[in-house]
Regions:
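Acidic, serine/threonine-rich low-complexity disordered tracts
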Residues: 25-101, 174-280
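Bacterial Sec-dependent N-terminal signal peptides
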Residues: 1-30
């Protein structure tokens, strides 16, 4: 190879790797920088495989659901953000014992099936009921008002599970940097989500963050249970606002539920995808 051709190849190589070099050196200061009046539409979909034991029998259930939700920024101060929201629709499908039941809150026909109607009764406790919460500009949750929802534990876990809001560190971070945060998804319980965040990529106006978390609990909603598991995945956020664009979380959970002195072991494997778009 001549000296000229060697220099040409070297130049092409440097051009090829330069975007990766620039990306590795890029740093960002992530925080929630939204305005009062901003409205975000959410779609949350999840597929779960549930295996549980009862009466010495092992049973399996496939469960998938979609929630459609709106969150509006009602107030922004120098140290807090107030969010008002509601869930407007759910589509849920459950398969067990060879039967498949689907409930769509926007389709009255789906509620004609007695089992679907029973599912609908439960979902009506949370659909179109307002809730509110506050957080600081780094994503640390403050007050959460779910009093209008008669069955709010699952919603609380979802809102505060790490699938919608990352907790950002103070100051600038670079690709490869990691930080940790302990999250309590349900107030008054000992459930904990210990999350490790890693900035994986910055591209244009979006940043990709890896999540590697451990979930533990011994008591949830007054029910004695042992829960251990992992939640891993990625979330893409807007660099300018810090707000979620899309997240994918994979869950692997083992739990024992205690009722009347009996234990019911179960395993849950699933993937939850959350997408958010600015409406206004």
């Amino acid at each position: 190879m001549t000296r000229k051709s060697f220099l040409t190849v070297l130049a092409l190589l440097l051009i090829a790797v330069s975007p990766f070099t620039l990306q590795a050196q890029k740093s960002v200061n992530l925080k929630y920088n939204v305005k009062a009046g901003d409205v975000y539409d959410y779609t949350i979909t999840s597929d779960q495989d549930i295996v549980f034991e009862a009466n010495s029998q092992t049973m399996a259930m496939d469960n998938s659901y979609a929630f459609y939700m709106t969150q509006a920024i009602s107030e922004v101060t120098s140290d807090s953000i107030r969010i008002e929201g509601k869930i407007s629709r759910t589509v849920t499908t459950a398969s067990i014992f060879g039967m498949t039941v689907t409930y769509d809150s926007d389709d009255p026909v789906s509620a004609q099936n007695p089992m679907s109607a029973k599912m609908g009764e439960e979902f009506m406790k949370i659909l179109n009921k307002p809730f509110s919460m506050s957080m600081d500009h780094q994503g640390n949750m403050g007050n959460m008002d779910l009093s209008q929802l008669s069955d709010n534990e699952e919603l609380a876990k979802n809102l505060n599970s790490g699938s919608q809001f990352a907790v950002y560190p103070e100051g600038k971070i670079s690709v490869g940097d990691s930080w940790e945060k302990e999250i309590i998804p349900v107030e008054g319980s000992d459930m904990k989500f210990e999350a490790k965040y890693t900035l994986l990529k910055v591209s244009g106006k979006s940043a990709t963050i890896g999540i590697d978390g451990v979930v533990t609990a011994n008591n949830v909603g007054g029910e004695e249970m042992r829960l251990d598991g992992t939640m891993k995945g990625e979330m893409i956020v807007d660099v300018d606002t810090g707000w979620l664009i899309e997240s994918t979380l994979n869950q692997e959970l083992d739990l024992d539920i205690e009722q009347n002195g009996a234990k019911f072991p179960a395993t849950i494997s699933g993937t939850t995808i959350t997408k958010s778009t600015l409406k206004n």
